[in-house]
């Protein structure tokens, strides 16, 4: 094997060793063992919420360990591939080994991103809200396309998704939607998606086939836990009930099961209509309200720190990504410069490259 390839393999070994140390592989195995014991408890399913969390955490931990062990095995096999290629003496065999080296580098770098998720709430599940912006019916349709994109991403990773509320627009699409992604580190990954997403395309709703620019806002919050101590006095919340509605304003429930919570001190309003009963909707809406109050508290603390440091802080608002379907095809992140020329794949949930680039960009900004 030539010195350059040896150096590449040594560098990958050093990176993977760092990943194994940061993730704590031995600790991960111990956590899996404990979760397996918890999952085998016959009384676990008496508490549905806890049971779902245990099984989700177990699946995620097992998958993470499996990926690390697979990367280590492939890295150990790589020198053997080059030895076999040298014995065969054929260019095809060398090219095959080089291709595996390139792919392994990409996979280890992707795993390395996981070690960058060290923020206070990065390990949490994520609560995502999408709102249509300027652009009329096209913007409502665009908001629904974004919702589908994130749900497809979660499905590809086998992450459970729970939709709390969907407010449908009159003609097509949605005014807004709120859903949770139930997976460890979902917040750390998806938090870089927060901001305004811009779509440029030939409008399917325009009889003259004119190009239309549409906007939608994405908000990502960490799901609250009991340790957050977000206490909401009963008198601070006004509860309104109404009938759930579907596309075009059509009623989808004959009872007043949908719930609207208004937090009187802050004016924050949360709705939930996707559960079957009023009680379930109220519980879900309260979870969303707690997450929004936690985020408000975090933003206030961050503003105080920025004032002490003498700077204005960084803004995640405004346009952060552009999706162009016409006159050319390109999805480009305006912060990281990462771009992909296949919008169809991106809109079908292939956003890992954007997430990885965003996480690396955020960490560089934090270090500045």
Swiss-Prot record:
The modification N5-methylglutamine is found at residue 250. InterPro entries: PCRF (IPR005139), Pep_chain_release_fac_I (IPR000352), Pep_chain_release_fac_I_sf (IPR045853), PrfB (IPR004374). GO terms for molecular function: translation release factor activity, codon specific. It is found in: Cytoplasm. GO terms for cellular component: cytoplasm. The keyword Ion transport does not apply. Signal peptide: none annotated. PROSITE patterns: RF_PROK_I. Methylated by PrmC. Methylation increases the termination efficiency of RF2. It holds the Pfam family RF-1. SUPFAM superfamilies: Release factor (SSF75620). Its main location: cytoplasm. The keyword Nucleus does not apply. It comes from the Bacteria. Keywords: Cytoplasm, Methylation, Protein biosynthesis. Peptide chain release factor 2 directs the termination of translation in response to the peptide chain termination codons UGA and UAA. Belongs to the prokaryotic/mitochondrial release factor family. NCBIfam families: prfB. This is Peptide chain release factor 2. It comes from Mycolicibacterium vanbaalenii (strain DSM 7251 / JCM 13017 / BCRC 16820 / KCTC 9966 / NRRL B-24157 / PYR-1). The gene is prfB.
């Amino acid at each position: 094997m030539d010195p350059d390839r040896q150096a590449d393999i040594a560098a990958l070994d050093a990176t993977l060793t760092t990943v194994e140390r940061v993730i704590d592989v031995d600790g991960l195995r111990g956590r899996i063992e404990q979760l397996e014991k918890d999952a085998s408890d016959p009384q676990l399913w008496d508490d549905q919420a806890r049971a779902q969390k245990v099984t989700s955490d177990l699946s995620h931990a097992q998958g993470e360990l499996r990926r690390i062990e697979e990367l280590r095995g492939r890295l150990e096999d790589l020198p053997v591939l080059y030895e076999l290629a040298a014995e065969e003496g054929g260019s095809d065999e060398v090219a095959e080994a080089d291709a595996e080296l390139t792919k392994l580098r990409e996979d280890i770098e992707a795993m390395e991103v996981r070690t960058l998720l060290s923020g206070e709430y990065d390990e949490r599940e994520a609560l995502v809200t999408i709102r249509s912006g300027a652009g009329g019916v096209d913007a409502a349709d665009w908001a629904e396309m974004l919702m589908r994109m994130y749900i497809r991403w979660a499905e590809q990773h086998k992450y459970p998704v729970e939709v709390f509320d969907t407010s449908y627009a009159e003609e097509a699409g949605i005014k807004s939607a709120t859903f949770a992604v139930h997976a460890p580190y979902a917040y750390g990954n998806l938090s870089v998606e927060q901001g305004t997403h811009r779509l440029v395309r030939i409008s399917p709703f325009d009889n003259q086939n004119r190009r239309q620019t549409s906007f939608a806002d994405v908000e990502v919050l960490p799901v609250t836990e009991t340790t957050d101590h977000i206490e909401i006095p009963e008198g601070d919340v006004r509860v309104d009930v109404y009938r759930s509605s579907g596309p075009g304003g059509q009623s989808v429930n004959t009872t007043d099961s949908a719930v609207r919570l208004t937090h009187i001190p802050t004016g924050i309003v949360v709705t939930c209509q996707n559960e079957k009963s009023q009680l379930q909707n109220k519980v879900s809406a309260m979870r969303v309200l707690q997450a929004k109050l936690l985020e408000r508290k975090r933003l206030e603390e961050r503003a105080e720190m920025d004032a002490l440091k003498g700077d204005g802080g960084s803004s995640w608002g405004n346009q952060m990504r552009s999706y162009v379907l016409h006159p050319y095809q390109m999805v480009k992140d305006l912060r990281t410069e990462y771009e992909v020329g296949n919008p169809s794949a991106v809109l079908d949930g292939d956003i890992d490259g954007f997430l990885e680039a965003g996480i690396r960009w955020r960490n560089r900004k934090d270090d500045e």
